[in-house]
Every structure is written in structure tokens, then in C-alpha cells.
Amino acid sequence: KEYSDVFIIVLAAAGLVFSHAVMSFALAFMALRFVLVDKSRFVACRKDVLLAMLAYFALFLAGMAWSGDMNEALKQLNKNLPFLIVPLYFFAIPLPNRKSLFQIAFCAIAFLIIASCIALIRLYFFDVEDIRSALPFGSHIRFALFVCTATGFLAIRIMERYKQASGKEIGICLGLIVYFIAYLVLSSSLTGIMLLLIVFMPVCLFVATKRMPKRIFSFAVLIFSFAVLIFSFAVSFFAYDYFVPKNGECKNGMIENGYCHQVNNETIRDSERAEMAVGLKKYLNIAPDSLFTDKDCKYAFTDIASRYFVCKGLERTAENWSRLSPSDLDNIRNGIPNPVYASGNPLKVRIYKTFFEFEAYRKWGKIKGSSLVQKIELWQKGSRIVEKGGRWLFGVGTGDLRQELNKSLKESNSQLADSGLMIHNQYLSIFITFGLVGCLVFLFFIIYPAYRTKLYKNAFYVYFLALVLVSMLSEDTLDNQQGIMFFCIMNSFFLSRNIETDKKTYLCSNEL
């Protein structure tokens, strides 16, 4: 029985990283195990905590009553089944011992290492554009969240056990922390890096003040401060290189790599396209009207070449094609509009692309293809939904969020209409779907179990919860099967260890 639970949890961990189907199998096994397991522990548990944990799923059930699209409501209910099954499972099974916990943790970290290695190999050694394509198993944002969780847990473990831990154990943990942080940088995961800056550093410093000598704490502060300084300096340097003109002021144009695009005069633009067309035919044997296909978008090679010339600081003339290197020609042939994108510095590439997204939005109002600008557009249009018909109290219902969001986008003639995108803010999603009542239920669902079980004293749980809550500001963390299963498993695992009604207490910090 003990090993069956280890198998189920390890299977769920593998599914989180590698496969939605495996996650579904793990969830089915959890439901079956709950039916078959001895219910003595379940009967003795704190029912108020369990009911609070089931409140969010109950919200989806209740929301079906005022949902217009019942088919979508049933899909949402099915997707959110982990909020029902996972807590019941963890509250019923026997508590895993230390050996089982080690086996589960070992497998979970091994899965992260394997998946991250595959992603980096695909990203750097194969023709893969970005981490979204390099990580074929699921959402790269959710994977970054998993990596940040593992990084924080390893750091907290070192700080809480530094007196008892062997040098080998500390060395392994530090090595894994360095590897996971390196993965986030090499994969240019801005979300993961920001989560580390906002959550990892403050929580770790707080734990260090409680657990470690002042000398080691001071050293940790120095390391963290140096990391923040380096990151801030890099972003500032990139911004200076990108936005500060290198050849005079840039009036009525957009700037890239310090050079100005003059895009207002169509006569000049047509003349420059003609010059680019000559070079495309002569040097790359590409027809002037050829298009480069990137996913769902198509771009004219003349525009790609024109932008590349500007980024190099070259005048857009046929004669200047001779000044391009073979690698420059290959970049244009491969649809790369900026030489920085082929520099091999993933963090710099991601930041420069973000800069271009803002410039394109400022100059042309271009939204599609820009992740950050898209989110702002979705937040603006999504917030309008609750203003109609007094929906601020109960929301639109379990199954109507996607439909109502698309309707709002169409009414404002947004470029994101019919894109199928969601809000990308979990709090706003809950408010639109279930209104103010739903937000209050969600707060109860998050706060009450942690308060009742005193897990706010547990550094592991505080870090996990802070990480998830911060990620919800820019992502629908709980609107994706990976995110839902991850939250349910971690939250239920921690809470289920403090649910005994007698005076015996199980502290995760001492067992992990």
C-alpha cells in the first residue's frame, strides 16, 4: 500500500513534466485509491480544513447554475476535477515516511533535469526557435514554475539542515540550484527569473535570518545583492543599446538597436523595398514577393531584410548587400530580422524582442505576437465584461468566460478576437467568472486551511504558496491541467500532514 501511493505520486510528477495523459492516469488512480483505502485517517481528519479545500471546486459546481454555455461549463468542471479528487486522496492515504518522501523528491527532480536537458539540447543544437517549441511536453511557463519551486525547496532545505547535512548533501543541493537557475537564464525564461527575484530571494533571506549564523546570512545577502545588481545592469545596458540613438535623434520613427526606422513615408519605404528586392534576388536567390512563414504569421522577405539593415546601421540600398557577412545572409534567409536574435545570448534576445514589441505597439498599435502587450490588451478588454449587467457580484458563470472575453474583444475590434486566448491573470479570471462572491470564496480556499493548520510557519509551504500567488498576476496558473494538478498536489500534500485532530503534529519542514 505504501509503495502504491509512492507510485501514484511519482506518476503524477512525471505527468506534470512530460504528459497530460499520464496526469490523467494518475488522477484516476488517486480516485480509485481513495475508494479502496481504509478511511480511518479520513474520518479522523479536520473536516473544516477539508471543506475549505473543496470550496473552490464547489464554486465551479454552483457557477453552472448561471452559465449560458453548458457544454463549456461541463468541460471546465471536468478540467477542475483535481480540486475534488486530490485533496480527498491525500487526506485519506497514510502519511508517507521519510524514505518515501525522498524517493518522490528524487524522482521529481530527476524528471525536471531530464526535461530541461532535452529542452536546452533542442534549443541550442536543433532548428528550434524558442523555448516554447523546445519544450514539447507542455507549457513552458508552468515548467518554469516547477523549476522555481524545486530551486526554492533545495535552498530552504540547505538553510534548515545546514548543521545536520553532510558536505556531499549541501554540494548536491547547491549544484542543482545553480543548474536550475542556469536553465532559466539559458532558456530566456523571464517569468522564471522574475519569480526568483520576487519570491525566491525574499523568502530565502527571511529563512536565513531565522536559521543561519550572521556570517553566512551576510554572505547570502551579498550573493543575492550581486545577482540583482548584475541583472539590473544587464537590462539597463541592453535598454541603453536599444533605445539611445546612435546617429542623431529619431523623430516620427521607431528605434531598434539604436538605429531609426523611418516608417511614415510610403514612397521612401517602397523605394527601399525595391532596393532590398534586388539584393534578395542577387545574393539569396529569393523572389521579391516571397514570404517567410513563422507559425501563423507571414512576413515579406523585403521587410525582413529592410529591418535587418536598419539593425546593422546600414542604409537600405542594393550596394550595401555586399557589406553583409555570410552569417548575415543566412540570418535573412532564415527570417531573422535582427542580428541580435542570432547572437546566442538567450536573455538578451528575449529582452530585445520585448523592447521591439513595445516599440511596435507604440508605433503601429501591433498587439498580436507580443506576449506582454497581448496580456495588457486581454486585461483591459476582460475587465469590461464585469461592468455589464451587474456581473460584478456573481460573474458570468462556469462556462462563459471564453465566450464573453471573445465577445468583448470583437466589440472593440481587437486584433486578438477569435484568438482563443484567455485572460492571463488568474485573479481577474476568477472575478469575471464568479464575481465578488467567487473572489471571497477563493480567498477562503487559500487562507483558511493554511491558517487553521498553522502552515504559515512552514517555510516550504510559504514559498510554494507565494510562488503560485505571484505567478497568477500574469498567468492563468489554475486554468491549465499542469497548473491545476501542480497546485492541488503540492497544496494537499502540505495540508494533509497537519490535519490530525489529536495533538500529534506533522511538520513538513523537518521531514522533507
For every predicted segment, state its role.
Residues 29-34, 196, 200-201, 445, ...:
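Transmembrane alpha-helices of multi-pass inner-membrane enzymes
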Residues 300-312, 316-321, 346-355, 359-434:
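Long extracytoplasmic/lumenal interhelical loops at the membrane interface
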Residues 49-56, 70-94, 103-107, 112-116, ...:
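Aromatic-anchored transmembrane helix interface
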